[in-house]
Amino acid sequence: MAREALYGRMGDLTDSVYAMATLFALDRHGARETLQKAARSSGELLILDRYVASNAAYSAARLGDAGVIEWVRELEFSRLELPVPDLQIFLDTAPEVAAVRAADRASTDASRAKDEYEKDSGLQRRTAEYYSRLAEEEWAGRWIATADGDKIIRAVQEIVGSGSGTEDSRS
C-alpha cells in the first residue's frame, strides 16, 4: 500500500507523515517472520534496501522534526518487533547525483518512474541530512557512511566473518 500511496493512487494519504510511516512499517511487518528467521540463521547474510532508518529519515525530513525518529524506532523495533540490523549502510552520495540516477532510471525503465518523494528535490536533500545524522549517532546500531564500495565490502566481510556486528568499521 505504501508504494501505491507514493504514486498517488491512495488519495491524499501521502499528506500525513505518520500515516505513510505506518504504511512503510506495516509493509516490513508483513515480512517480519521471514526477516526474523533470516536474522537468526547462522551463516546467512540478509541485505535490505530502505529498512527502518529510511522511514525515520524521510519522516523527519518531511516533518522538519527529529522527534519522529524515536517514534519510528519504537513502532518498528519495539511494537512490530522487527530485527535490529547488524550494520546499516548509508550510501553517502550527493542528493544531486542521486537525482540524476533516479531520472536516468525513470527514463530507461517505465517501471521505475519517480515517486512523490523522489520528485521533491528539497525532501531528498533534507532526507540525506537526516541520514547523515542517523549514521553519525549510530542510530539503532552500527553504521558505515560512505560511497566507497571497498569500504562497504570490508565492513560486511567483518560481520560475516565474525558472526557478529561488534567490530568498528565506521568511516
Segments from the language model and where they lie:
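NTP-dependent small-molecule kinase module
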Residues: E96-S171
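A glycine- and Lys/Arg-enriched "phosphate-lid" helix/loop adjacent to the NTP-binding pocket
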Residues: N55-E129
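ATP-dependent small-molecule kinase phosphotransfer cores
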Residues: M1-L80
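Hydrophobic/aromatic beta-strand patches that form the interior of the parallel beta-sheet core
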Residues: I47, L87-I89, R142-I144
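Short beta->alpha linker loops
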Residues: D27, Y51, T93, A147-K151
